[in-house]
Amino acid sequence: MEAAIKENKKIGLRSTAHHAQLNVVKWNVLNSARAGLTSMEHWYGLPEALFNNRIIQNYPPNYNYQNEQHRFEEAGKLWAQAAKPFSDHWNNVMDELISLDFTISPTLNIYEASRDLHLSLIHI
């Protein structure tokens, strides 16, 4: 990631990434922003940057990454594991991202559409 960002910056481009949920334990949004990434898609990697007392997400033993609905449900629960809004850690992360001119594009509407589609299929 760092090499790609470095090359991108050499030619004067901004950059964005979709952080893979399987990799954000090792490389979260703060790592990317500090390396020079200028924006992120969705929000994967942001709760992990906001963790206070853990590095690894606390997923249940039956977590199934291959099941999109299960993955979205459990990913949404990561916010409960993150620092509380406006706490010192939360403010420090947000302040650093702002100081790095980092942009977040959460793209939440697709989650609602996917949820509604799956709910409609259950009732067929």
Predicted regions located by residue number:
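Conserved small/polar residues in nucleotide/adenosyl-binding loops
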Residues: 122-124
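Histidine/acidic residue-rich metal-binding segments in metalloenzymes
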Residues: 1-106, 118-120
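Acidic/polar, glycine-anchored loop/turn motif associated with catalytic or activation segments
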Residues: 110
